[in-house]
Regions:
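Short secondary-structure boundary/capping segments
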Residues: 23, 45, 70, 127-128, ...
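A contiguous loop/helix-start segment that scaffolds small-molecule binding in enzyme catalytic cores
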Residues: 4-7, 63, 74-78, 97, ...
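Class I S-adenosyl-L-methionine
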Residues: 1-112, 117, 211, 275
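Class I SAM-dependent methyltransferase SAM-binding "motif I" and its flanking Rossmann-like core
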Residues: 3, 14, 85-158, 201-204, ...
């Protein structure tokens, strides 16, 4: 057998948000490496009964690479399960570099991000015509510094939708930097804790209430914050489905008078969406 490493995105938590390809990759594993602190144990139900299961929360990169070397020697399939999508804050590239040096075949299987899961949970689109057409994935600088130009204040100047990972442990600083970057105090926010897990908590609030909301939830880890005017915009429509818009599959139509609806941003108060 030829060794291979399968990097699998487990999604935000709920096992039924695994993709079919992810399920098949877990079922094919001789060795499963997963982080019990980040991934719900239900995903292991798809692993073979005789698979070796290793919890990566106590492992270093060197420990993981030792497993990969053993896989090469013994022709094993290792399924490395990451939370969310492996390409976003997954510490995956350092593994890929090492696997390439070892000459082991690998595959990346994408997963549902916590950003998508949180937006779905509150019933919002993150890219609204005339309001926001970009989504910034970022985090606050902590023990791991940010590159030049990627401080939170710098990115907040764009005023578009922002998804903040790994930032809930410093709520006062988070709120301050977003405000200083240019978001208005009434900018809508969503705080999502362990979204799609049985104990998920999701709360909406204004930006000037963000720090107090996070403190009230008493969350520091497993928390995503969404910020931006698109989170409470309504009354817009896309050009793509406008009668006045012609494209490859449909000509423009005469009923174009009602094609444009101005954007309206609602006021947003603190609201528990689910608990």
């Amino acid at each position: 057998m030829t060794a291979r490493i399968l990097f699998v995105g487990a999604g935000p938590g709920a096992a039924d948000l695994l993709t079919l390809r992810a399920v098949n990759a877990i079922a094919a594993a001789d060795v499963v490496i997963w982080a019990s602190s980040l991934v719900h144990e239900d995903v292991l139900e798809h692993a073979p009964a005789d698979a070796e299961v290793l919890d990566s929360k106590v492992l270093t990169l060197e420990d993981v690479l030792a497993v990969y070397r053993r896989a090469k020697e013994q022709g094993l399939t290792v399924t490395r399960i990451h939370s969310g999508d492996p390409s976003v804050y997954g510490a995956m590239q350092e593994q890929l570099d090492a696997v390439d040096e070892l000459g082991i075949a690998w595959e990346i299987i994408p997963g549902v991000t916590s950003v998508a899961a949180t937006a779905a949970a509150v019933g919002r689109e993150l890219t609204i015509p005339e309001i926001a057409q970009s989504v910034v994935f970022t985090r606050m600088a902590t023990r791991t510094p940010m590159p030049a130009g990627e401080q939170l204040r710098d990115l907040a100047r764009h005023g578009t939708t922002m998804a903040l990972f790994l930032s809930a442990a410093r709520p006062n600083r988070l709120q301050t930097e977003l405000l200083e970057g240019g978001y208005g105090p009434d900018t809508p926010c969503v705080v999502g804790y362990r979204v799609s897990w049985p104990d998920e908590r999701i709360v909406t609030c204004r930006l000037d209430e963000l720090a107090a909301t996070i403190r009230q939830l008493q969350v520091t880890m497993h928390t995503l914050v969404l910020v931006g005017p698109a989170l409470h915009a309504r009354g817009t429509r896309s050009n793509l489905y406008s009668p006045a818009f012609a494209h490859t599959y449909r000509p423009a139509r005469d009923d174009a008078a009602a094609a444009h609806v101005p954007a309206i941003a609602d006021d947003l108060g603190t609201q528990a969406v689910t608990s």
